[in-house]
Amino acid sequence: EKVKEHYLSTLQPAKAKTILGCIELLESRYYEVARPPELQKQLDREWIADMKDYPEDLIHQACVNWRNSSQSFAPRSAGVLMESVKPEYVRRKSLYLKAKSVLELI
């Protein structure tokens, strides 16, 4: 059971506040467009919805990877931003599912 909990802990989703904090900090490094408050709220909701399954450490790592890339603009979508950490996320999910299925056999 501890093994399953360990792998599950590596998939613990980030909180909405963490997601927005990371995105706001990353976007602040680039040219920012003034947006009406309602539009900004909708964009924030979309970022949260699109990234709600990702663990906090992978969101931070994706932001670091973006900052250290040759991109001269802020990411426009979660898919583009998270591309660099997607293999690690998939690896973690696979390990969790394997551990879970093995433990169910025991």
Model-predicted segments: where are they?
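Charged interaction scaffolds used for protein-protein
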Residues: E1-I106
